[in-house]
A protein has these predicted regions:
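A short, well-structured edge-of-sheet supersecondary motif
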Residues: 58-87, 316-317, 323-327
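C-terminal tail/sorting-segment detector
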Residues: 388-405
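Active-site SXXK
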Residues: 76, 93-119, 146, 188-192, ...
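Residue-level detector of functionally pivotal "anchor" positions at catalytic/ligand-binding pockets or at interdomain
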Residues: 29-42, 355-381
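Penicillin-binding protein/beta-lactamase superfamily catalytic region
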Residues: 172, 211-320, 333-338
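Bacterial Sec-dependent N-terminal signal peptides
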Residues: 1-30, 361-364
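Active-site helix/loop module of the DD-peptidase/beta-lactamase fold
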Residues: 113-151, 198-229
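Catalytic-site signature segments of enzymes, centered on catalytic residues
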Residues: 89, 152-228
């Protein structure tokens, strides 16, 4: 019991400190791109003392790692914007799990408008029997547990995208286990649609897209993929950088929810808020394995960075201390990661060397030296006697290997 309360005190301290840090390091945004049209002010890289040689090295790295598009915003203005491998500024691309962070904002907006309360049971909105849990177990699952990845629904040896009740059965009490389980997240769409009485795309279009000039939509299949062009992704990042405000208008005005969203949400994974990844924490977990890594999620990145991360390197990095947004879309950069954390760390190595005073000696074909530090099965046990194994490396990379016998 004492350990539990000490965890709660730690979270309260981290939340208070992070709120103060985020608010004091965020700049007063003086520039926002127009809601309509293609006009968007730029800032010369030379104003940031970035050298063209180092920029070229970064772009080569991006191209060699299957990047489709890349944007860096500073003070809301475009410093770098590159389209590669057949992509263009009008091409729509999927966000993958980076859309989880978008959904967190939408849930917050629905709560702000009184449609739902994240302390409510999920069953309040989508009815009973949405899982194979007992009635009491199901009632104990709240919307906030879906946001925190702590529903306790089984994530071992199942289709993580299956939202049928037969796929969703009890493993642990909510808040006792952090697990990156896609199905409870996918059901947030049903929660929002039931609560608001609107389709998810209609609600997003009214409350977000038309307010900040975004263009994007969720697909109709059960994977819930969100599609947009790259600048729309950057606009969303700019909105969150400015704490839910856009050019004087409050898009998400609930500051309590906003700060809960971008800070540690539970004691199990310090580096996870409400569907947002948080840098600079003492430890972190990654998808699909019950293992806690020491240190921050991205050691090369600023400690105040928050990120929306998706499969195959879909990335939105938000850095309040630098008033900067970094967006990457593309195909798999070959990091063998369920999310983009390892690739994101590599990316930051190049970003950190953009200044003319830096010497960029990286080869675009080089790989970080790494060693295996642990081999576990899907349950998190140290073993090599399993058909499915997860190899954990010193740089945070995780490889899933299927052993054929």
């Amino acid at each position: 019991m004492r350990s539990f309360f000490s965890h709660i005190l730690i979270i309260k301290y981290l939340l208070f400190f992070s709120i103060v840090f985020f608010s004091t390091t965020s700049y007063t945004q003086s520039y926002f791109p127009p809601i309509s049209g293609n006009s968007w002010d730029t800032l010369s890289p030379s104003n940031l003392n970035w050298c063209q040689e180092n920029i070229d090295t970064l772009i080569n790295f991006l191209e060699m790692t299957n990047t489709k598009s890349f944007i860096i915003l500073k003070d809301g203005k475009i410093v770098l914007e590159n389209y590669l491998n057949g992509h263009s500024d009008t091409t729509y691309w999927y966000w993958a799990s980076a859309a989880k962070s978008l959904m967190a904002v939408i849930v917050g907006k629905a709560q702000e408008e009184g449609y739902l309360n994240i302390e409510d049971s999920t069953s309040t909105y989508i009815g009973s029997g949405w899982t194979s849990c007992s009635s009491s177990q199901e009632r104990n699952i709240k919307i906030k547990h879906q946001l925190m990845m702590t529903t306790g629904i089984n994530d071992i040896g199942v289709d993580l995208n299956c939202i049928d009740d037969t796929c969703l059965f009890f493993l642990d009490t909510p808040n006792n286990r952090w697990a990156y389980h896609n199905a409870p997240y996918l059901l947030l769409r049903d929660v929002v649609e039931s609560a608001t009485g609107q389709g998810i795309n209609m609600y997003i279009n009214q409350k977000l897209n038309t307010q900040i000039g975004m263009f994007g939509f969720f697909g109709v299949n059960n994977t819930n993929l969100f599609y947009s062009n790259t600048r729309s992704m950057a606009r969303f990042g700019l909105l969150v950088l400015n704490q839910g405000k856009w050019n004087g208008s409050s898009i998400l005005n609930d500051s309590i929810y906003f700060n809960q969203m971008i800070n540690t949400s539970q004691p199990l994974n310090e580096s996870y808020g409400y569907l947002w990844w948080l840098n600079g924490k003492n430890s972190h977990m990654q998808p699909r394995i019950q293992f806690t890594f020491n240190g921050s999620l991205n050691s090369n990145a600023p400690t105040d960075m928050i990120s929306a991360l998706g499969k195959n390197g879909q990335i939105i990095n938000i850095v309040p201390s630098k008033n900067m947004i970094i967006v990457r879309m593309g195909n798999d950069p070959d990091t063998n990661s369920f999310i983009s954390a390892t690739y994101n760390n590599q990316l930051w190595d190049y970003i950190n060397k953009l200044e003319c005073s830096s010497t960029n000696t990286n080869s675009v074909n080089s790989k970080y030296k790494k060693k295996v530090i642990r081999i576990i099965d899907p349950v998190g046990r140290n073993t090599s006697n399993s058909n499915i194994l997860f190899y954990i490396y010193s740089d945070g990379a995780i490889e899933k290997k299927i052993i054929l016998k």
